[in-house]
Amino acid sequence: MAPGRVGLAVVLWSLLWLGAGVSGGSETASTGPTITAGAVTNASEAPTSGSPGSAASPEVTPTSTPNPNNVTQNKTTPTEPASPPTTPKPTSTPKSPPTSTPDPKPKNNTTPAKSGRPTKPPGPVWCDRRDPLARYGSRVQIRCRFRNSTRMEFRLQIWRYSMGPSPPIAPAPDLEEVLTNITAPPGGLLVYDSAPNLTDPHVLWAEGAGPGADPPLYSVTGPLPTQRLIIGEVTPATQGMYYLAWGRMDSPHEYGTWVRVRMFRPPSLTLQPHAVMEGQPFKATCTAAAYYPRNPVEFVWFEDDHQVFNPGQIDTQTHEHPDGFTTVSTVTSEAVGGQVPPRTFTCQMTWHRDSVTFSRRNATGLALVLPRPTITMEFGVRIVVCTAGCVPEGVTFAWFLGDDPSPAAKSAVTAQESCDHPGLATVRSTLPISYDYSEYICRLTGYPAGIPVLEHHGSHQPPPRDPTERQVIEAIEWVGIGIGVLAAGVLVVTAIVYVVRTSQSRQRHRR
């Protein structure tokens, strides 16, 4: 009987061992139907090292399918290295989900994913770009897919509306909305019609659109159901709100949707240091030209590497023109030319394209100081001479006599001579003495902008005319008058003879 007792003891011990294993499996499965990819982090719930559960694989409920989202979640964020898998055992379904991490939404959720490109909803139209922002002069392509367009005689019309200060569409339309049985709002220009032979003859086509446009700015390509609107060049004139209307041939406005095209152009930066005369303050002008849209432009000025903080020294103005906007900023130094060395100015321009993107550029230039010339005027017997020493090359004189605002440059002769300073020259101009005026003005012209007017005034009594010369002049004048009277008389006689002969000829024909 000893072997029987031994066998009974072995059976009882095996049942006890098996019960312990089932109890451990149920405890592990109570955490939910997820797969445990790693060791248990709570030490109070971990099995002892000598128990069979120490080498166990993840617990799986074979009677129900585990949530795949939970599997992915636990695999991607393990807290400890994964343990070898164990044999799955049947367990009961948990009554409550784990409280540590909520279950994500199932994969068949219909909410569109948020990404850079729009998804394809089951609506009547889908466009890949509803609000493109393009650089000036670039080419823009918008691809739209029209549902059920191949099942009917499809017709597409595209209208453009401006986005100026007084847009024809107010309030701004919803770019995601699809309209039904809505005709195009008034004030638009037609840029495309897939059936141009059916277009209303009173419709206004946009520039570069319509039959015979050369060169064409708009085109629509691609086989249905996908159409691609191509704008050849984005400018302030071609940007705006585009209304796409489509439907059957007999109902082209069955559906409609909006697309917005916006343009941007960073400014070009130039710096022009002013050439100043001795005794004038240094100046420099920075220009941010032809940018769009009219977003803030900020200038920071530096004079010899020192920032100019005084707002009274900086004058900034913005001007609007057809191609965009231009901002001009001028800084005036507290230093004076001739008293200190020439100044170096640096302009730092920042233009904000939007709340995130901006452009920043720098420009540097050296302001020059020109010596103040000395102007002299000398009267001779028959000529008057005006001289200016050490002026920039290209500077010349303009003469004015009395109150006559017209310069007497036709009678002046100007010559330039070398000066001791490089880039400068001495200018001398001569003018015949006038018999009609006593006041003379010689004015320097050709200086850079910002230089004050430099001129010299002189007086000289007109000399008496030579009697013989005066008689000759009067005789010539009388001869001219006589020739004019004679020519007029000849014309009158010729006209009379012509009229008489014409009258006689008519009388002969009547007889």
Swiss-Prot record:
It is found in: Virion membrane. Residues 1-24 form the signal peptide. Residues 43-80 have a biased composition (Low complexity). It is a single-pass membrane protein. Disulfide bonds join 127-144, 286-347, 386-442, 390-419. Major attachment protein that mediates binding of the virus to cell surface heparan sulfate or chondroitin sulfate. Also plays several roles in host immune evasion by inhibiting the host complement cascade activation, and by providing a shield against neutralizing antibodies that interfere with gB-gD, gB-gH/gL or gD-gH/gL interactions. This is Envelope glycoprotein C. It comes from Human herpesvirus 1 (strain 17) (HHV-1). The gene is gC.
